[in-house]
A protein has these predicted regions:
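Feature marking well-ordered beta-strand scaffolds used for ligand recognition
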Residues: 1-143
């Protein structure tokens, strides 16, 4: 995690957090990283690339508002293969995950109070799912 100085444009490393288990030996890379709409939690996904040791996960990290450090709270599945991108809905009630290699867009419940990702609300086949853009049909706040 880094602090950004908006006056100078500089980044300063604050903390490095290891998401993978110490004994993990498979191939895995980072996918997406973003904050919850209220800025209380940081979310990060990893991609394991179809290996038996694959590690397609989404991690929830609590942000310390005093110093910007984070602590892993929990991790869970992305409900597909090779997550590329995720987005919260503008109201913060749902989290959408695009899983590229399983060609799916997953919609999950999200509880902003606890930072907990809930049950699957919808699962849609989307060939080459890789990017998500959410447009508010009421004409407000595209994400």
């Amino acid at each position: 995690c880094c602090q950004f100085n908006s006056k100078t444009g500089e980044l300063t490393e604050v903390q490095c957090v290891e998401l993978l288990p110490e004994d993990f030996m498979g191939e895995c890379i980072a996918a997406e990283i973003d904050c919850s709409p209220d800025g209380a939690y940081l979310f990060a996904t990893t991609r394991g690339y179809y290996t038996s040791e694959g590690y397609d996960r989404i991690f929830t990290l609590k942000i310390n508002p005093d110093d910007g450090t984070v602590n892993i709270v929990r991790d869970g599945p992305t409900w597909g293969v090779c997550p590329r991108m995720f987005k919260f809905t503008p109201d913060g009630k749902f989290l959408l995950i695009a899983n590229q290699f399983s060609d799916e867009l997953i919609v999950l419940q999200y509880d902003a109070t606890s930072g907990r990702i809930g049950e699957i609300c919808a699962r849609e086949n989307v060939p080459y799912a890789g990017a998500i853009c959410i447009v508010d049909t009421q004409g407000e706040n595209p994400v």
